């Protein structure tokens, strides 16, 4: 399925698309270069919207039921590239991180690699799930990647009833 990313208001980060929508829901298909229009990505987006419409219709007509639990990823913080005293980037995303969004990393695993082959590692004990790894659009915001924590929501009957009520089903 599609990963669910919860990015609650982070006062340190502004200017993101989710801030422009009153419901706070954004479906992002990417990565996409800025000011680049790609018909394949637009087509993928339409497929997802149609799928979500069918899913809600099937739920409304009792042809499917909600799962017992839902995994989602909650934004924790974002980190910048390692920089020198002149604020120049001194290390790049480690090759093991490239194209590995949504995959958990443990303490000691590589994040960055500098020109001298020095590896900068993840230092926390708790598993973290990085997203937006090396996204060009976020470099100007000094974001090399964002860290999320994976959580599981148990979908008991009370939650399911509330969700269906929210959707007016």
Each model region followed by its residue ranges:
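Structured catalytic-domain cores with a bias toward divalent-metal coordination
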Residues: 1-169
């Amino acid at each position: 399925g599609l990963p669910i990313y919860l990015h609650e208001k982070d006062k340190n980060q502004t200017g993101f698309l989710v801030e422009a929508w009153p419901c706070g829901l954004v479906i992002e298909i990417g990565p996409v270069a800025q000011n680049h229009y790609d018909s394949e990505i637009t087509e993928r987006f339409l497929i997802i919207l149609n799928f979500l419409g069918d899913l809600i219709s099937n739920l409304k007509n009792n042809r499917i039921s909600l799962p017992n639990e839902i995994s989602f990823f909650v934004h924790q913080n974002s980190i910048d590239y390692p920089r020198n005293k002149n604020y120049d980037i001194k290390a790049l995303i480690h090759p093991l991180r490239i194209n590995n969004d949504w995959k958990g990393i443990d303490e000691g695993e590589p994040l960055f690699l500098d020109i001298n082959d020095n590896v900068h590692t993840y230092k926390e004990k708790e598993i973290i799930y990085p997203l937006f790894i090396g996204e060009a659009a976020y470099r100007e915001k000094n974001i090399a990647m964002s860290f999320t924590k994976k959580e599981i929501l148990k979908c008991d009957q009370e939650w399911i009833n509330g969700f269906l009520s929210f959707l007016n089903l």
